Amino acid sequence: MKKILSRALVVCLALSSLPLASCNANSSVGKRQENVLRVASWDEYIDEGGEDSYIPTSDALYKEFEVWYKEQTGKSITVEYITLQDNETMYNKIKMGDEYDLLCPSEYMIMKLAAEGLLQKYPESFFDTSIETNYYAKNVSPYIKEVFENGKLKDGSSWSEYAAGYMWGSTGFVFNPEKIPPEVMKSWNALTNPLCERKITAKDNVRDSYFMGLGMYYEEELLTLKEQYKNGLVSRETYKSELKAKMNDTSPETMNGVKKKLEEMRGNLYGLETDEGKLDVIMGRLDASFQWSGDAVYIIDEAEAYSEEDENPLLLEYSIPESASNLWFDGWVMMNGANVDAATAFINFLSIPINVIRNMYYIGYTSCIGGDEVFSYIEETYGSDDESEILTEYNLSYFFGDNHILITTEEQTRRQLFAQYPDEGTIDRLVVMEYFDKETNTRVNRMWNNIK
């Protein structure tokens, strides 16, 4: 992982001002072709092979899939792997008539595409664990499986009917515990705390910003609710339902309260950022930043590597607010008219344990796939038997299944391991943010544009 992160930092420095482009020169065609699987995803979101791969002699995974598919089916397939800039770019291309077999959007865009009737459901055979090559159904984490089966679309369908999980994570704060007390970073109001004045950044996008605003606006109510749940006064179902309702509240009254919180936040920030803020934290110029968990791992890794020759290396930590935070995921979905056989085979190929490990190593994010082989990789990455350090048990059974307990250093429960796999108590307070309908989207964008 260190190799790819160092490479990514160089790319970030050199190309941060350039737009992302497709890795396939023919992507502008936009139409399906016979024996071609059109896959749309994000830049550097799959193992591209070569020296930065977990297996340096390997080819890109989507190229290796072509060989595997021929071996499995006797049929030839060419993967046209297209990278897009963001979810909105993906949506606009679809609305303009571009056709894809597989897409890898984020959770809210999956909901939007499904609601607009642009996606087709997975066949029942995809979930049949008796089929040898159904690696996704056999290996998906029990936690992710539950999230997808319990998540509902407007028509009552489960997310699992339309989406197969790829990567997942949380949102929280990366921070320097030597400069800002960890207790401060357990609250959404760190964004307005004088101790963080001009030392913290937030995301320059409306969805993350509105979620942060909701966190500040409802923090006291959510902490009270959490205490009631902890003391057995409310059920888990009630707790999760209330969390979801509060952290997806877009009523005019709530939006006005959120606006005031975000205005207060804006005056306390160093600035709003997309990717450039990562480097400021890595270099020690900023003390805290709101980040997605995968980027948090990258920042923590790079800050330590950059300062490793210093007398006091920069050891950043990751904190998820105590009241609530965001559970995000990217998932594979099929457009109407997709090549179902090739599309589902592609997902299953990526769900083979060694390919899961390759993707996690290359990307730095956390796969939706569990299983013993992936746990062994996490154990290899974060486990420790060094008796000179403070060791602790870290229970990952919620994700990998019963009796998957990692022996790790105490500091990892606040650093990369915690960012990739929060403990089960933290998982309970994570909630998915749903998509905005057209009217809500107009209101929230108007509010955000007036603030930033």
State what each model feature region is.
Residues 42-59, 108-285, 299-302:
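Extracytoplasmic ligand-binding site segments that recognize negatively charged/polar headgroups
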Residues 84, 104-105, 202, 272, ...:
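Short beta-strand and adjacent tight-turn residues that come in two discontinuous sequence segments
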Residues 402-452:
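Conserved C-terminal helix/tail region of periplasmic/extracytoplasmic solute-binding proteins
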